[in-house]
């Protein structure tokens, strides 16, 4: 050996940059929260400790629409059980009238404004109870968590991402999480557009936003791009992506059925689920291909979409975006528990690479805070 070479060279392991991507899906957000609660609970019980701080396990959390609500709660330090309770307690007020076919769509023609106005008030109140007045800058500076929340700025009809990361500047620092969630979840037809005060010009006109799911219902590419922008050049990236138990999509259409009217599209209500389904497939595969290409160039990027098994056929009647029936929520929670249990089984298999990646994430989590950031700031 050469005289200048160290005798005991120790390999240095660089901690990965971890990002979480959370899909939109209306009331199916209760599935997302229940899944994370169940899986986190398994690891907490295994360590003989109380609840774990899942939000702190990630450098970046991206969430769209209902995923923005879950993302904000994680960043704020709320338990996922609190989010499940939000959907259970307030879901029927947020979506006071379900669109289930042509007849219910027609019923919305005269009373639709009333329904979405009531839902807007209910959602803002529910979010304020959970998130308080916490801003993007608060969770970044006090919790060390970056957020990226897609929406649509209606004044320019362009995509916009509310974000606070080490390289994002200060544009969005003062926006409260409540306003950001309202902006990202303002689904046309199902809910009101979101009128939000611009904190950089509080005396000016309000900004109007529409649901981020119009362009990024699966925000995995948003998460990947921000991870690439903020991770160190030699830092491995681990990207975790979670859906909302989306229903199997597709329909057989005969040639004589292609001339659909507005009523055949339930006055537009059926377009949203079609867009969501197409986006989720496209964005997930684009992220997979991009991550693979970058990995081939020497950048370490690992990506997990969990759970990734087919949705049981028995779940089909309970997967509408605005289904607030107690039995629908019960079924979503039950399915989340089943899927989380299967994911934990994968984590217990030493030969399952994806399971081991998830296991390392959860085993490194800190205990959950005694109170969320919103309560801490309110008491000061």
Where do the model's predicted regions map?
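Patatin-like phospholipase
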Residues: 1-380
């Amino acid at each position: 050996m050469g005289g200048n070479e160290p005798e005991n060279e120790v390999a240095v392991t660089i901690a990965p940059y971890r990002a979480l991507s959370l899909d939109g899906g209306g009331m199916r957000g209760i599935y997302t929260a229940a899944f994370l609660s169940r899986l986190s609970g398994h690891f907490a019980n295994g360590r003989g400790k109380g609840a774990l701080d899942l939000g702190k396990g990630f450098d970046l959390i991206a969430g769209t629409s209902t995923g923005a609500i879950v993302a904000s709660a994680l960043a704020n330090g709320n338990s996922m059980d609190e989010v499940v309770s939000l959907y259970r307690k307030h879901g029927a007020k947020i979506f006071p009238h379900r669109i289930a076919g042509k007849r219910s769509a027609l019923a919305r023609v005269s009373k639709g404004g009333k329904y979405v106005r009531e839902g807007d008030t209910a959602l803002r109140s529910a979010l304020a109870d959970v998130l308080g007045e916490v801003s993007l800058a608060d969770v970044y500076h006090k919790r060390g968590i970056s957020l990226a929340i897609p929406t649509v700025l209606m004044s320019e009809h362009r995509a916009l991402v509310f974000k606070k990361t080490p390289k994002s500047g200060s544009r969005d620092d003062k926006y409260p999480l409540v306003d950001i969630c309202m902006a990202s979840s303002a689904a046309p037809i199902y809910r009101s557009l979101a009128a939000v005060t611009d904190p950089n010009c509080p005396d000016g006109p309000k900004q109007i936003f529409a649901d981020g799911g119009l362009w990024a219902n699966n925000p995995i590419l948003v998460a990947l791009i921000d991870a690439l922008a903020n991770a160190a050049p030699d830092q491995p990236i681990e990207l975790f992506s979670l859906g909302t138990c989306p229903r199997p999509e597709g329909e057989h259409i005969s040639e004589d059925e292609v001339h659909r009217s507005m009523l055949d599209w339930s006055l537009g209500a059926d377009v949203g689920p079609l867009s969501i389904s197409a986006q989720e497939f496209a964005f997930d595969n684009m992220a997979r291909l991009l991550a693979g290409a970058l990995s081939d160039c020497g950048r370490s990027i690992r990506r997990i979409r969990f759970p990734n098994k087919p949705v049981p056929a028995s779940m089909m009647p309970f997967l509408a975006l605005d289904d607030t029936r107690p039995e629908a929520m019960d079924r979503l929670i039950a399915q989340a528990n089943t899927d989380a249990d299967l994911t934990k089984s994968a984590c217990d298999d030493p030969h399952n690479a994806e399971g081991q990646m998830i296991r390392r994430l959860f085993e490194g989590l800190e205990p959950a805070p005694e109170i969320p950031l919103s309560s801490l700031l309110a008491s000061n």
